[in-house]
Amino acid sequence: RTAEQTENLLVNTHATFRWKHGLFPAFDHDQMTALDADLYITLVDNVDAIHERLIREHDVPHTLKDILVWREEEILATEVMSRIIRGHGCFFVVSRGVERDTALSVYRLLFERNRRKVYPSFPMTHVINVPQILTQIDLFRNALTEHFITFDPGDMDEKRLLYEAGAATQRGERQFNIEVNNRRLTFSVDQVTSVADDIDGQIYARDFKLIDQSDMIVSFIP
């Protein structure tokens, strides 16, 4: 088998897929058990970034709600699979990153297993318009990334969609434009506000997941 002849093996696959509105597993349990992977990682990204890639690279009818559901299904299915096959502590959620590349965290999870895992805690919502504090926060985050595996809540920013939708509503507009993956996209205010509770709920749940998979929380209080 390839796995037996390879020192380091990465398997890139979905845990689930949908076909004709049905949900199906995208893996064979016997094969995954035989493979007995050391680590299971679900890479996640902002809903607007996934939407942009879908319309650019694939012909897949979808809504923002669909993307949020698919993402949650992937996380849950992968975690369940990892626990059944490998046990607790072998599954991680890692963000692709908005302003920074998180590939280093993945590398360290794979090859520097003794390095401590950290959840950086810092103010976000209430300091958006305070540049001096934002600079301090960036220095804090960068310092942690230099020394630890970081599961940074700031590596995803879906609140931006909700803020932009709210601003458009105040202007009396039904659509708004934002830049996503270096491309200007138009979003419907109604479509974004219809998933506001889902976005907030998943942010809340994801933060707990990132904390749970960390060894410690390091807080910055400006």
Regions found by a protein language model. Give the residues of each.
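Structural recognition of the conserved hydrophobic beta-strand(s) that form the central parallel beta-sheet
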Residues: 9-13
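A mobile, often basic/glycine-rich helix-loop segment
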Residues: 30
